[in-house]
Amino acid sequence: MKRRRRWRGWLLFPALCFCLLCEAVETNATTVTSTTAAAATTNTTVATTGTTTTSPNVTSTTSNTVTTPTTVSSVSNLTSSTTSIPISTSTVSGTRNTGNNNTTTIGTNATSPSPSVSILTTVTPAATSTISVDGVVTASDYTPTFDDLENITTTRAPTRPPAQDLCSHNLSIILYEEESQSSVDIAVDEEEPELEDDDEYDELWFPLYFEAECNRNYTLHVNHSCDYSVRQSSVSFPPWRDIDSVTFVPRNLSNCSAHGLAVIVAGNQTWYVNPFSLAHLLDAIYNVLGIEDLSANFRRQLAPYRHTLIVPQT
C-alpha cells in the first residue's frame, strides 16, 4: 500500500508540474500576444500623428501674344463668279509699282506659266451711258475706269474660258479725252515725263472710232490680220453696247501668247478675247496714237484718256 501511494505520489507530482508548466506557457503566450498588440497600436499612433510639411506655392505667369491675320477685300457694286486661265500669279493688294520694264503691277502680277488665276466672268456695275449731241460723245456722271477689275481675289478654278475673236464682229473703240489727270488711277514711270502740252493732245482726234471688217474662219493658233481704219464720223451707234471695263491677263502686253486673254465686260456679259486678234487691235490703237512700241504698257500709254470703250455690234 505504501508503495502504491508512493508511486501514486510520484505520478501526481509530475502531473502537477506538467499542469503548472502548461499554465505558465499559457500565461507567457498571453503576455506575448498582448505585447505584440500594444506594439502594433503604438506604431499606428506614430504613423497617424506624423508631421506634414507643405512646400510654398509657386506662381507662374505666361504671356502669349496671338496675331490674327486680317484680309481686307472690297469690290464695290460687283457680283462675280470666277473661272480661270493657266498662268501663275502673285497678289499684291493696294500696291502700285512701276518696274524698269515700264510695266504696272496692281492687284495681280503675272509671272510664269502654271497654276491658274481667277478672272471676273459676270459683273453688275453701276449704271453708265454714252450720249451723242451734235456729233460730240459725252459720258454720264459715272465713268467706268480701268480699276473695275483690279481687286479680284486670285483663286484656283478647274477650267479655262473659251477664247473669242474680236475680228468676228464689227467693232469700234472710242477714246475720250481726259479732263483731269488726277482722276486717272494709273501709275506712270517717274523717269518718263508726263505729256503736259495740250497742243500734242489737240493733234489727236477725239473721239477716235476704229472699225474692223473681218469675214473669215478663225483658228486659235493662227495669227490672222484685220484691216482697221479710223472713222471720220463721230456719230455713235445706239444699238451697240458700251464696254464697262477692259483688263488684260497677263498685264504686260509684250508677253502676249496663246495663253493670254483680254477680259472685256459689258453689263452682265463678258468676252474673252484671243491675244492674236487683241495684238492687231492694240496695233491699230498705237498707230493712231503715234505709239511705236507695241510692247509698252497699255495702261500707261493711255494715261491721258479717261476710258476705252469697245462696242461690239449686237
UniProtKB/Swiss-Prot annotation:
PTM comment, free text: Highly glycosylated.
Record's compositionally biased regions (Low complexity): 47-114
Gene Ontology CC entries for this record: host cell endoplasmic reticulum; virion component
Subunit structure: Interacts with gH. Interacts with UL148.
Protein name: Uncharacterized protein UL116
Family affiliation: Belongs to the HHV-5 UL116 protein family.
Role this protein plays: Chaperone protein that cooperates with UL148 to regulate the abundance of gH complexes in virion. First interactor of gH in the host endoplasmic reticulum, regulates the early folding steps of virion assembly. Then, UL148 is recruited and favors the binding of gL.
Keywords annotated in UniProt: Glycoprotein, Host endoplasmic reticulum, Signal, Virion
Signal peptide region: 1-24
Localization (cell): Virion; Host endoplasmic reticulum
Region (Disordered): 47-116
Mutant lacking the gene: phenotype: Deletion causes infectivity defects of about 10-fold compared to wild-type virus and leads to reduced expression of both gH/gL complexes in virions.
Positions glycosylated per UniProt: N28, N43, N57, N77, N101, N102, N109, N151, N170, N217, N223, N252, N255, N268
